[in-house]
Amino acid sequence: VTAPNFPAGWTAVPILGGVNFVTTATNPDSAPNSAFAADPDTVGGGTDLSTPQFPITSNSATVSFRHKYNTEPGWDGGVFEISINNAPFQDILGAGGVFLQNGYNGSIGAGTNNPIAGRQAWNGDSAGYVTTIVRLPSAANGQNVQLKWRFGADNNTAPVGGGWNIDNLVVSGNTQ
C-alpha cells in the first residue's frame, strides 16, 4: 500500500481533538511505509487505527506486529484493543488476551485529557522497532474480531519528532 493510503478497510479516526494516524514513508520497519501517530506537544487527545473485521478460527491464534514509540514517558503512549463480534472495544488484556512478547512497559498518568489516562500502555522510548506478540482471547475463537491501536497524548511536552509507528501485522495460528 502506498502512502497516504491505508490497506482496504482500515480506518484512522482522531479522538478528543487528537492528531490522526497517517501512513508515512519515513522510517518504516519495511518498505514502503508504516502507520504513524505523532506525539503532539500542544494538543491532547488521540487517534485510533482499526483493522476491518476478520474471523478467528483457532484457540491458538496470535497477532504480531512491529512498532516503535518515542513519547513523553508516563503521559503519552499507545494501547492495543479488540472488539469481538461488534462488541465495544476493550483492552486486549481485559478481553483475556496475553502478551507473549513485548507487552506494555508502563502506564499513563490519570487526570489529563489523554483518552488512555490511567491505563497500562507502551510509552517512553523503545529505541527502535520491537516485535509484540499477543495470544488472542479464547472468546475470539469462532468469532469475527476487529483490532485497534489507540494512541493518546496529554496537551504538553513531547519528544521532537516523537510518536508511534506500527508496521508488519501478522495473524498466525488461524486455521482456514
Stretches found by the model and what they are:
Residues V1, T51, P55-T71, G78, ...:
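Extracellular beta-strand-rich recognition modules
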Residues V1-G46, G94-V130:
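Extracellular glycan-recognition surfaces and repeat-rich motifs
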Residues G9, Q53, D91, I133, ...:
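Extracellular/lumenal ectodomain signal focusing on beta-strand-rich modules
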Residues G44-T47, W75-G77, A127, D154-N174:
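Extracellular carbohydrate recognition
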Residues F65, A117-P159:
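Extracellular beta-strand ligand-recognition surfaces/modules
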Residues F80-I84:
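Conserved aromatic beta-strand anchor motif in extracellular beta-sandwich/beta-rich domains
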Residues A87-L93:
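Surface-exposed loop/edge segments in extracytoplasmic proteins
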Residues Q90, G173-Q176:
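Short, charged low-complexity linker/loop segments at the C-terminal edge of domains
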